[in-house]
């Protein structure tokens, strides 16, 4: 008792614990500890732990007392509101990497959720993160220095979740820049929004309690409680109950007794549940968070104990359930991953669809059951075995620290054969057994699995560059599981190692026959494919300087194509399959990786990297990027191949890189002439074009293009602000400029908005830090010119007003040119293209344009080039398509094409003997029919009995069934021998069919009613013309106005003769007009059924109600009648009458609608519709007539006639030849065309520095 009194004297009533320094507090705790250290009572141990926890807490309060919030601040009231109504919490939204929030209430509150920060709008906060380290009983906080911005604390507290102490957080309410947050904000300790509310609430309550001085009596009463520590729980409970029932007890003393009893109950509960052994501190904060320290004025301690006990039991059960759920979920994910890698994506996608339809996609147990059910026995065993291997591998990685793990990782990730073989030698030293080929090679150091024998053999074969047959033979002995799938290439067999379950590499797939490969046809189309895809890859490659992108793509073709040929025996077919395309892409990206790798190894090579990546990035980083790019860019090709997995692509990519390194070594690119390319880029930049256009409008430079070096230099200096020589003298500017984009042919302005690789501007192409210099100059100069333009605006506006007088005529002329129809038909007699309007009939071409005199189709695969200059030798070169890029330069132009079958020139096909062609085609058809008839059946009876590719009964060779040209004598002999037999069997089959047809009784059919003969009524034409206030000849000329003067049309002069053919374009033109009229009329009748009717129809009925729109179908007549039937008959029998019939029907339909009298509410609608439709048809026809007497010379002579064109015809003079011709389209689509592949301007020669 004396010891207790001493303690009571030290901790006397009224002492403010916040006034004690650290030494005094430690002395107090130590003395209490010395009093209780001899006791074995578990309650005393818990009380000691509580004292230490309380000491730590008070120390933190003392340290932060000056920074605690004022009790009068509105945050307290707001937090209380949140506790009552959590729905007023601000809504968190995330946009990319920016973190923003729009609060629904006050701005004083902020929340932290997961790894996202939620703050009021425009009020970012700063976080100072701290992590917690738990010792035996007393939690100690250690700050992790991650300060962001300035130090301005507002709130402080512990965060508790259940009975587990989690994190200690400081929150600051001062603005911080976004970049700092992105850089340093990762890993900042955060928690859920509920805990933030809870710890803020508990801290305010606790702070109020400590500032009130109530802590002193708590310490005193704890000391007094030690006097009664030997009393049993029942007596103590009775003692407390008697105190509570006494009316004279002071309220403060009553509360003290309740706290004592409450703490005793806590001690008892701690001794029951071991989960509380982490100390009193977590529970202390649980009390404040849940508000249970209201026991000071509301005795509810028993209710709390029951609630806490139940909660801890539930928490323990939930933890066990969560652990099991996590384990099953991980297993389900691994099953899917293994299935995609080993079996393919198709089956895994099917399982996902089944689970989605059944609503079990979130149930891991259902996923596991469905995977096992969908797989066969071998597949299920493969998946289960692989999962157990992965799980075992996880355990090994966690526990095992053997040196062989690092070596195996280096072996499997090696990018060169020599490097992998060297690592393999180091691994073999660790083998527990030598020459093991039936089981895993174990490590003699740790005893765990080291390397599968098939991997050991595979590395050796690759390093020795073994042939396909050798690899297949040696690796097949490891195969124990195979999977057969069928795709668009046929059956594919995937074999897996029976030891480790890993797929044996792709070179043993599709090995059923020796003469059929899986790669498909690799003709010139594949060369074009590689060239095009390499150019596309330039969009993400960063070159250190300007490079020749043609050279880049050509090297890729020369490097990749031979390696692709060597993969398998090549099929000689007309097209290549998706697997071949995928191989090509893999080797293209391996070629790019080799260039990057070479630039890192040899500093003399041009630096090559990936946009957004540093030049010194690791090779693995580049591999990861290229693999991701490959799978994203070519997912369409990959999805066509059901057996292709991500692991398959990664393995082949690694092998392709090894082969390229082994065959070509380090590779580099040459650099283009910086001066020429830089000037080209500047002149073709849209920004430069804008500045130059403004300067021409303003009058600062001439309107025409520069014609002399002096004019070119003057224009360049006006736009840029300095001469080319001055600009190029700044070496630091253009030395670091680079470009990696496939630049489109800007000389074809019609394709500016339709090119695949068009970049934004010069700023994107240059991309270096020096680009701001030239961009700033261009912008400043463009702005100066624009200001000058504003100053001269009045003069310009007067000239513009003068031009406006003729704008309508100019627009009409452009509309005429836009609607002109061109038919580019190659005339073999003249060697030129026919360009005609729609007033012509198609020319009948001879059959020799398609077939030669042997009945074989032409193949125009030989290109005939002639020298542009007559002095050039040789004067003519004939090359195949694949050799164009090698042998042809800009001194030659394409003159003709030659057939590789019959060797005739394309313009000479008209000279072939037509009768021979027809005879050969007839014979070829006869042979095809004959041999198709006897493909299976034998003329001697039954089926063919082939031995050594020859039927032993009739003598038919298998190779002449489909090939009638290689052995013509055998083909004719066999045909002559069995021709009579063929005719007899054919007639016999035909007679049987005739008998079947005769046996069928005829059905009675009603005779078709004869239609009334049609007669032309010219009165309808006159009546229509009168309403429209035009000449009847104009109505009669619908469909036949093209190329005629409108003055002649009105007078009825110069009308073309009546059509004599059903294919006459005038019939199609008038019929189209009628169909358009009927279509729009039906839209008007049934407008209530349209969601989006034509705008001009909707405008007519916008004032009607929905009921009135529905009634239009009832009140408006059907004007179609028998038009389509009658027109079709007349078009065949009498084309001239068909033309007049269509025009008359159009007039009748117009008059029928125009003369409607009732109901009154539709009269105006129908009349306006009829007038609008017919006027539109006639105005469209007028645009096709010849232009009038408008004088285009007011625009200047260059506008009408350019170059050597002396034609006086307005249309032909205005149309520049070759603008839309096939030669332009072919050249743009041909990546091997030499003409203008590189952008070049004549002005470059004038701009060269002097």
UniProtKB/Swiss-Prot annotation:
Belongs to the asfivirus M1249L family. Together with the penton and the other minor capsid proteins (p17, p49), forms a complicated network immediately below the outer capsid shell, stabilizing the whole capsid. In addition, blocks IFN-beta transactivation mediated by the cGAS-STING pathway and regulates the transcriptional activity of IFN-beta. Mechanistically, suppresses the phosphorylation of host key adapter protein TBK1 and degrades host IRF3 in the cytoplasm. The keyword Iron does not apply. It comes from African swine fever virus (isolate Pig/Kenya/KEN-50/1950) (ASFV). Keywords: Host cytoplasm, Host-virus interaction, Inhibition of host innate immune response by virus, Inhibition of host IRF3 by virus, Inhibition of host RLR pathway by virus, Late protein, Viral immunoevasion, Virion. This is Minor capsid protein M1249L. One of its GO terms (cellular component) is virion component. One of its GO terms (biological process) is symbiont-mediated suppression of host cytoplasmic pattern recognition receptor signaling pathway via inhibition of IRF3 activity. Its main location: virion. The keyword Iron does not apply. It is found in: Virion; Host cytoplasm. It comes from the Viruses. Interacts with the minor capsid protein p17 and with the hexon capsid protein p72 capsomers; these interactions form a rigid zipper structure that stabilizes the capsomers. Interacts with host IRF3. Induction: Expressed in the late phase of the viral replicative cycle.
